[in-house]
């Protein structure tokens, strides 16, 4: 029987140690905290819309398992990335267990609660800053901060659960569609969502207290 490099008993401990090194939202992966839209905007270094073009995985020289994602950026609401750019980042964890040269199996797959990335999917992502010690990166709020776009509708892996809970914006700043969206459940109109996020960032609503 092949050896498993991280056993069933040791895996939670090894995972917790690795996530602690990543910092930011990854450090809370073992106890995923619900975050709403205001928190996702505030915690993100960049907010991008685009398409996933490549997904691979590997093990870094320091032994850290990663999934490498390349995206084509269509638009950006926050940060230095611009439409037309290609962006590549690495997220903690493998796509699937990997057979190592010594015959053991590295079972450090992407942890539950992290976003999944698939070639061809369109998305809006609230990207947290890269971890200072490892360079690994994921989304603010983990899977809450990556929303897939399909047939003009947008939702995250939790069907937008809690995304608008507690979000407060003066009615005078909102369109009728935006007011309806903030009180809705499940997938919402992608154009309305992206438009609201863009105006919130451009208008600096969170810093001015207009969005809470």
Briefly describe each language-model feature range.
Residues 2-14:
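Bacterial N-terminal signal peptides that target proteins for export
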Residues 12-23:
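Bacterial N-terminal signal peptides
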Residues 27-36:
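Cleaved targeting-peptide boundary
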Residues 28, 102-212:
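Netrin-like (NTR/C345C) domain of secreted extracellular proteins
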Residues 50-52:
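Conserved hydrophobic positions within beta-strands
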Residues 55-60, 78-79:
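Short, conserved beta-turn/loop elements at beta-strand boundaries and strand-helix junctions
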Residues 59-71:
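Short aromatic-glycine-enriched beta-strand elements
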Residues 84-111:
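Beta-strand/loop nucleic-acid-binding surfaces
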